[in-house]
């Protein structure tokens, strides 16, 4: 079951987001698992498993193994576990949710496969995309961004806080979660529009627990 409160602070990450860690693939995997457990203890409200980018795992077996470990941690703390893009994996692992973008599997197909099993999040980068999908009851929330410049979405045009305002003012009733370049310094600008999703604000933080506390207080 979907509860919009889980959008307050969503941590999004994969092993590739620990590129700053010395060592190889296994060191990045361990860094993800350690950071996820700390984040769960610090009361993030959801975790989204996302393997994308140059250093992302490529072997489906390794991806599944890591996803399972992340899922077990989320279950231990009673926190929703969401899989980004990998619809089949979300179904196989019985993830709580699945999040897809505009370039991933067609949203109608995702709904047909997942609506009885997972809640569904959809990324929107324009007002038109939000208006087009507003009638899809099976879509639980919209992920809106990138709000600020971000290295994880280099090819996407920054949409700014203005897009959140336009979507809300257009009468779209779905919960919104902002993503892209969100930090402890700018998160407060987004409070009135819904939740926030972050990657580097947690993975790159020296004091991760403190960063999460600040993000939760701002969200």
From Swiss-Prot:
Keyword Transferase annotated: yes
Residues noted as binding Mg(2+) in the record, renumbered to the chain: 85, 104
Gene Ontology CC terms: cytoplasm
InterPro entries named in the record: Aldolase_TIM (IPR013785), ThiamineP_synth_sf (IPR036206), ThiamineP_synth_TenI (IPR022998), TMP_synthase (IPR034291)
Pathway: Cofactor biosynthesis; thiamine diphosphate biosynthesis; thiamine phosphate from 4-amino-2-methyl-5-diphosphomethylpyrimidine and 4-methyl-5-(2-phosphoethyl)-thiazole: step 1/1
Cofactor: Mg(2+)
Chain residues that bind 4-amino-2-methyl-5-(diphosphooxymethyl)pyrimidine: 48-52, 84, 123, 153
Keyword vocabulary terms for this entry: Magnesium, Metal-binding, Thiamine biosynthesis, Transferase
Co-factor: note: Binds 1 Mg(2+) ion per subunit.
Database matches in Pfam families: TMP-TENI
EC annotation from Swiss-Prot or TrEMBL: 2.5.1.3
Protein family membership: Belongs to the thiamine-phosphate synthase family.
Stored HAMAP family: TMP_synthase
Function: Condenses 4-methyl-5-(beta-hydroxyethyl)thiazole monophosphate (THZ-P) and 2-methyl-4-amino-5-hydroxymethyl pyrimidine pyrophosphate (HMP-PP) to form thiamine monophosphate (TMP).
Protein name: Thiamine-phosphate synthase
UniProt source species: Helicobacter pylori (strain HPAG1)
Gene name of this polypeptide: thiE
């Amino acid at each position: 079951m979907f509860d919009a409160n889980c959008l307050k602070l969503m941590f999004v990450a994969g092993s590739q987001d620990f590129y700053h860690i010395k060592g190889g693939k296994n060191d990045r995997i361990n860094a993800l698992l350690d950071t996820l457990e700390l984040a769960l203890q610090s009361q993030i409200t959801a975790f989204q498993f996302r393997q994308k980018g140059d250093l992302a795992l490529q072997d489906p077996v390794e991806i599944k193994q890591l996803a399972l470990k992340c899922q077990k941690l989320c279950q231990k703390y009673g926190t929703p576990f969401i899989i980004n893009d990998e619809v089949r994996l979300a179904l196989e692992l019985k993830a709580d949710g699945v999040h897809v973008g505009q370039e991933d599997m067609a949203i109608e197909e995702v709904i047909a496969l997942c609506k009885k099993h997972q809640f569904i999040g959809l990324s929107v980068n324009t007002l038109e995309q939000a208006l087009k999908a507003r009638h899809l009851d099976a879509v639980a929330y919209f992920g809106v961004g990138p709000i600020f410049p971000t290295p994880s979405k280099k090819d996407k045009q920054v949409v700014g806080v203005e897009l959140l305002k336009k979507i809300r003012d257009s009468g779209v009733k779905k919960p919104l979660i902002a993503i892209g370049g969100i930090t402890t310094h700018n998160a407060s600008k987004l409070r009135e529009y819904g939740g926030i999703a972050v990657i580097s604000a947690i993975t790159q933080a020296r004091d991760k627990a403190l960063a999460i506390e600040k993000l939760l207080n701002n969200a």
